[in-house]
């Protein structure tokens, strides 16, 4: 159900929007964790390392697609906030066209070059074949991933965070069942995990399309709505492609870290894989608050209600920082138990490395919390330059950790890549936000 975020108490709106978004993101991570958990417990640590070593490459390609679809939803959210419902439909159609064209290119390039990328990353010979098999399946399903991400972002742009949640929960259950069936019963190995993910995404995308057609008139396209002017296409590309490249720039930094981990051996790769899966789950509250601010700021920017944006940012910072501190403490206390859940007993070397990961990462979640809020708020008002610059800062910081610190301090040196990247990205985003706010308040920019 569509929700107007340009009126009402900002704190209540932000909280009510974030909760289903957070639950949805939790299930999205369960999607990913199911593959990792079932692979690690049924096939073994070697297979776990194979799937884990693909994470940064998947982030590079799928992250580009996800960033693009999130950017495509911003002009639509601004038009929805301005009550321009004809413009909403035109925006939706243009977003579909850009997504289809991008999916074709990404599928072709990723399937052609994924083996070469694995070799460039110095993926250990013991796991490279398994990693390649998994990637081919995942990249073959880029269309389904992009379709679901576009439609779920479009739902959120009109203030509906609940509908994509319902479909995602069903898809997550389907993914886990298929994981068990394909891996444990049919013995399909890491490829089975990939097929389970792709089929579940297809289900989610189809469910979203059916729901839009039956329940959401503002998104139901007729022949008259199939209008794609050059100006409209340029506007969507101006916002969406910088966000897509920003995601890929960040992903290149994670690839640099993965190369460093690969050189440290399968034990380090397995420890980082398990720890990062937990980490991705832990940061979801902070990320969800940030994503909420993209929709909230976009709608209010379209409605020219700027004071509501500033108030929303202040309220969101309070909530997000609280979660960051609490989650960081919990992970530092219980990380050994959580790591063992992935690798089982008898791998204490992996568990110890996982503990070190959270010692460096869990204590710095406050940086990430602020980063998400400032980044998504700026993106919501159409300011994409600084978030892209911040992505470059993340790349630089991660590269320094991978090339220099990992050689000096081993696994610990590689784990400080995230805190360094978060801080390096947060600073320019914070400065840009307050410059933008000052310009708007003084009438320099509207």
Specify the residue positions occupied by each region the protein language model found.
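Hydrophobic transmembrane alpha-helices of multi-pass small-molecule transporters
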Residues: 60-63, 175-179, 205-209, 281-284, ...
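Helix-terminus/linker motif at the lipid-water interface of multi-pass membrane proteins
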Residues: 26, 30-48, 118-125, 181-188, ...
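Small-residue-rich hydrophobic transmembrane alpha-helices
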Residues: 48-108, 145-164, 272-335, 368-390
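Short alpha-helical transmembrane segments in multi-pass integral membrane proteins
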Residues: 1-18, 76-141, 185-241, 297-364, ...
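Residue-level hotspots within pore-lining transmembrane alpha-helices
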Residues: 27, 31, 61, 65, ...
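N-terminal transmembrane alpha-helices
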Residues: 5-42, 56-71, 75, 100-107, ...
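Transmembrane helical elements of multi-pass membrane transporters/channels
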Residues: 16-35, 137, 148, 171, ...
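Short runs within selected transmembrane alpha-helices of multi-pass transporters and secretion channels
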Residues: 69, 137-156, 164-172, 193-208, ...
């Amino acid at each position: 159900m569509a929700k107007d975020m340009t009126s009402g108490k900002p704190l209540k709106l932000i909280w009510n929007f974030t909760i289903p978004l957070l639950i949805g993101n939790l299930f999205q991570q369960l999607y990913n964790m199911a593959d990792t958990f079932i692979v690690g417990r049924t096939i073994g640590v070697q297979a776990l390392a194979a799937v884990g070593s693909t994470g940064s490459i998947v982030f590079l390609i799928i992250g580009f697609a996800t960033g693009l679809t999130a950017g495509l939803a911003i002009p639509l959210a601004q038009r929805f906030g301005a009550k321009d419902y004809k413009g909403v439909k035109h925006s939706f159609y243009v977003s579909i066209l850009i997504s289809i064209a991008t999916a074709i290119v990404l599928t072709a390039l990723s399937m052609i070059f994924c083996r070469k990328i694995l070799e460039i990353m110095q993926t250990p010979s013991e796991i490279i074949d398994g990693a390649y098999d998994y990637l081919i399946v995942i990249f073959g399903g880029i269309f389904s991933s992009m379709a679901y991400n576009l439609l779920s972002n479009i739902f959120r742009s009109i203030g509906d965070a609940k509908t994509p949640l319902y479909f995602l929960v069903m898809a997550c259950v389907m993914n886990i069942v298929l994981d068990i069936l394909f891996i444990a019963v049919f013995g399909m190995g890491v490829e089975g995990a990939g097929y389970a993910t792709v089929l579940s995404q297809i289900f989610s995308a189809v469910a979203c399309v059916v729901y839009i057609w039956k329940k959401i008139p503002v998104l139901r396209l007729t022949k008259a709505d199939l209008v794609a002017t050059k100006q409209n296409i340029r506007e969507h590309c101006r916002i969406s492609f910088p966000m897509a490249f920003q995601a890929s720039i960040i992903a290149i930094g994670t690839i640099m870290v993965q190369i460093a981990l690969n050189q440290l051996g399968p034990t380090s790769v397995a420890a980082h894989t398990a720890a990062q899966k937990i980490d991705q789950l832990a940061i979801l509250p902070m990320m969800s608050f940030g994503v909420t601010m993209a929709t909230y700021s976009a709608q209010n920017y379209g409605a020219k209600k700027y004071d509501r944006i500033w108030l929303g940012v202040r309220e969101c910072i309070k909530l997000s920082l609280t979660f960051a501190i609490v989650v960081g403490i919990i992970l530092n206390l219980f990380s050994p138990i959580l790591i063992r859940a992935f690798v089982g007993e008898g791998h204490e070397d992996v568990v110890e490395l996982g503990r070190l990961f959270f010692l460096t990462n869990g204590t710095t979640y406050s940086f990430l919390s602020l980063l998400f809020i400032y980044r998504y708020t700026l993106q919501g008002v159409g300011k994409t330059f600084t978030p892209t610059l911040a992505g470059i800062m993340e790349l630089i910081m991660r590269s320094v950790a991978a090339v220099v610190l990992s050689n000096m301090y081993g696994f610990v040196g590689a784990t400080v890549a995230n805190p360094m990247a978060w801080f390096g990205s947060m600073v320019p985003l914070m400065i840009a936000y307050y410059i933008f706010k000052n310009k708007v308040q003084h009438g320099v920019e509207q």
